[in-house]
Amino acid sequence: MGTRLLALAPWLLLLLLQLAGASHVVHRSLEAEQAPSSVPASIVSPLLRTGYHFQPPMNWINDPNGPLYYKGWYHLFYQYNPKGAVWGNIVWAHSVSQDLINWIALEPAIKPDIPSDQYGCWSGSATILPDGTPAILYTGIDRPNINYQVQNIAFPKNASDPLLREWVKPAYNPVATPEPGMNATQFRDPTTAWYADGHWRMLVGGLKGARLGLAYLYRSRDFKTWVRAKHPLHSALTGMWECPDFFPLQAPGLQAGLDTSVPSSKYVLKNSLDLTRYDYYTVGIYNKVTERYVPDNPAGDYHRLRYDYGNFYASKTFFDPVKHRRILLGWANESDSVTYDKAKGWAGIHAIPRKVWLDPSGKQLLQWPIEELETLRGKSVSVFDKVVKPGEHFQVTGLGTYQADVEVSLEVSGLEKAEALDPAFGDDAERLCGAKGADVRGGVVFGLWVLASAGLEEKTAVFFRVFKPAGHGAKPVVLMCTDPTKSSLSPDLYKPTFAGFVDTDISSGKISLRSLIDRSVVESFGAGGKTCILSRVYPSMAIGDKAHLYVFNNGEADIKISHLKAWEMKKPLMNGA
């Protein structure tokens, strides 16, 4: 016990400091304001506020910014409105953690207070310099009304402070400004910089003309004076690239990560596409001589590999030097209305941090919740070798499932009963899922109903649908979907189906699924993290202990629950809430 208390001492001290200055962190009561009569009571229920996903106590949150590890602490900065539950008044809020799960909020790190950011401090990244000092590159808005964008830099005021509580902005800001011919309103979100051949390099997202999204490349010898290269690192006719990210990968199948400046034979280039609000990436080669990035798949910019096929945007990765891994963070907005958000008093969460690495095939990334999440696991139940017949469902009982972690290995017999894939859908997984939702019976379709009411009036389906191989010798096509169309009886909710194809061979009949259920968010990982889907849902009946969990089979063949284990999840320290 003594060792445990010593380990907790830094946390307890910081928690006391936060409570002593709580007025700086929690801007008003956690009780929502008087809700208009048009807002359902369930929407403002505290039981719909997430239990273990990252969020501040109140108000608006969006992009994760500048994650880093420094002197024993993980730091996360994020776009935050301290004055309300809608976008605006953006500052860089700041939280710290020793495990990426329990978080304590500090004072905002970066606020509009110099000419080159006086109208906004937008997204950016952190870079650890050779002497160990962190530097933040971020976008500033320096003119009213037109969102004229420039890039700024900030350094810790006191590098000996492990909490990095104060930041200073040199007088030479801004360090990069739009040049003639560049769209100054589409020039933002600098990346973590990398160092090679005597130069630092960073990317800034941009748009040329109406359609050409690009990653501007900048170089600097001293991290102070930045010069734009003659050509971008990469570009494609996709629309504006927000929040670009560029990082090296280990060899296929190796789960360790690499620092951004370590050279590699494979890289990821990711962009957050402003037109669709999804995060896309490619795996490819970085030619250090020509300073160009080339995707392995020539059509990769348009085939649209995504980190997450659901509600997940403006993501950022960083290298964790403690566990030698690359960690992915992303933002999930609400799927209710602005009226509802104002009534709740809060809007937005971050996804659970994920470890990312290159699949053994070398074609895509794999993602998995960081291992620290398992420290929140509590009471559990297990199910073995349970057969679920066609048209039937099986309830998992013995624990609360509104805040849970569920891992299930499933086997399906009778793959010959799978439907043929209509070529009219092409590679449009979302449209296919919309047409072939969870309640469409036949073929091979099975999965979980989560946050379900006792009478199944409300339920969110996370499931697989299998289609026959497209040709001789081909493997069956596996579609993974989250279908929230029956997730709530409340009106005025956005309830889209989300879907992605799973690049796995189900010929053996085996597939796995993990779902993180957290009151108003369902975050799922198919086939060991090949396909991931996050969805926001707002049950009106399936709340708290009235939420249930089922395994369902709406196909024509038996399925077997080889092994299911579900855990209740405890609430971590979460920014004083």
UniProtKB/Swiss-Prot annotation:
Record's GO cellular component terms: apoplast
Coiled-coil ranges (or none): none
Residues of the signal peptide: 1-22
Known glycosylation sites: 158, 183, 333
Catalyzed chemical reaction(s): Hydrolysis of terminal non-reducing beta-D-fructofuranoside residues in beta-D-fructofuranosides
Name of the protein: Beta-fructofuranosidase, insoluble isoenzyme 1
InterPro entries (alphabetical): ConA-like_dom_sf, Fructan_Metab_Enzymes, Glyco_hydro_32, Glyco_hydro_32_AS, Glyco_hydro_32_C, Glyco_hydro_32_N, Glyco_hydro_beta-prop_sf
Functional note: May play a role in sucrose partitioning during seed development and in stress response.
Induction annotation: By sugar in excised leaves. By rice blast fungus (M.grisea) 4 hours after infection.
Translocase listed as a keyword: no
Principal subcellular localization: secreted
Tissues in which the UniProt entry reports expression: Expressed in roots, leaves and flowers. Weakly expressed in seeds.
Location(s) in or outside the cell: Secreted, Extracellular space, Apoplast; Secreted, Cell wall
Keywords: Apoplast, Cell wall, Glycoprotein, Glycosidase, Hydrolase, Secreted, Signal
Family, similarity comment: Belongs to the glycosyl hydrolase 32 family.
Enzyme Commission number: 3.2.1.26
Transmembrane segments: none
SMART domains assigned: Glyco_32 (SM00640)
Active-site positions on this chain: 63
Pfam families in alphabetical order: Glyco_hydro_32C, Glyco_hydro_32N
UniProt GO MF annotations: beta-fructofuranosidase activity
EC main group: hydrolase
GO BP annotations, alphabetical order: carbohydrate metabolic process
